[in-house]
Curated annotation (Swiss-Prot):
This is Aspartate carbamoyltransferase catalytic subunit. GO terms for molecular function: amino acid binding; aspartate carbamoyltransferase activity. Carbamoyl phosphate binds at R65, T66, R115, H145, Q148, G275, P276. Its EC number is 2.1.3.2. It comes from Xanthomonas campestris pv. campestris (strain B100). Belongs to the aspartate/ornithine carbamoyltransferase superfamily. ATCase family. GO terms for cellular component: cytosol. It is an enzyme of class 2 (transferase). It catalyses: carbamoyl phosphate + L-aspartate = N-carbamoyl-L-aspartate + phosphate + H(+).
Amino acid sequence: MTTMQLDSDGRLRHLLTLEGLPRATLLQLLDRAGQIRDAAVGRVGKRSVLAGTAVCTLFFEPSTRTRSSFHLAAQRLGADVLNFDASTSSTRKGETARDTLKNLEAMGVRGFVVRHPEDGAVERLAEAAGEGTALINAGDGRSAHPTQGLLDMLTLRQAKGTDFSKLKVVIVGDVKHSRVARSDLHALRTLGAGEIRVCGPASLLPDDDMLDGCVVGEDFDAMLEGADALMMLRLQRERMEEGLVPSLEQYHADYGLTRERLARAGRDAAVLHPGPINRGVEITDEVADGAQSCVLRQVANGVAVRMAVLETLLG
């Protein structure tokens, strides 16, 4: 898939996954996003980098943060933004996602931000895209969510510095169903994170090679010791079978992040969550809204990251 993302000169053509993405490309995107974020602090400007370029948010799954973030990012670069709603489109009449893309492409749309419930769906659409058309994966099934991975890495850089070699990161919760966890794991490995710990009930941990090289365990309290950053994951109840967790109350008792548990982690440990948060399940209000929470910073960084990606692909 990495080959499809890059053209013959090594330039990014699509952003489908962070798996196998060259370190230099990853750093280039993060550096550019950081520049955009720094320039935007205290003001919201509009640029003309993508003036005259049409970008479509092609979402076949519900979204609030990601869709709004991409819309704002494209607007701030001067693009014309078309929001596609699957519930009111010809897909209800049987039109395939591929035909939808090709028809919009024929109208002059050059950039597609795609979210889809099926694993690998965005890659298949990228194979069908014409020359000069760029696709960005905004989350497909359990496979990947590359811009979330990028904004998480940008948030970690801001909180902990650019050298990840001594960083101890704990990813907690429903790893099995999480495309965010997959993208974060690929990015952390590429950036040379010192130690990646993965914690959750056995029923919510993947049984493939996704966790190779990670410290894996079910004891949340033990995993927290000395951690520099905690990535709390949402329970993907829409993707999981019944009975994978006994109850939400029991899950919170075992894996919910409370102020008392946070005290076990390293001093000033950063707390991240991709949202939407199930308050009182993955994380308490006190922690979500506390001084160590980076949740809203992640949201703010999302616009900068998506501007950097759109600019790189279409500018």
